[in-house]
Amino acid sequence: MSTTLAKPAEMADRKWYVIDAAGKPLGRVAAKAAVILRGKNKTTFTPNVDCGDHVIIINCDEAVLTGKKLEKKFHRTHSGWIGRLKETQYKTLMAENSDKAMTYAVKGMVPSNTIGTKAMTRLHCYKAADHAHAAQKPEAVEI
């Protein structure tokens, strides 16, 4: 039995998908976006080829965190210098930069290599319902 592998030239035609995050858990939206960005929803998925599609996430302001995660969960960044750990509570992160919170969640779900880096360039997060990609005619994805 032979396995058909996708070639990078075959993956040039990428689709656009839009996900509405209003009232949905942040992690579930991020997980669905990561699957599409990686290309795992396709029958022609090949692990060493970047075969993912574009994902637009709208209404990031209305995404919810379940339980007590708003108060107890932190986003941590470290500059590499001693004592330079910065912690941001998700309550303030969701209030100020909800699109960044969604981006951080998706980034943690894609591989940390060149394919994951390319996949993250195809992620477009917006706080409100309007976006600048209507000309691409994105398909709606239900969660």
Residue ranges and their predicted role:
Residues M1-Y104, T114, A132-I143:
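Ribosome large-subunit tunnel/peptidyl-transferase-proximal elements
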Residues T103, V110-A132:
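C-terminal structural segments of small proteins and small subunits
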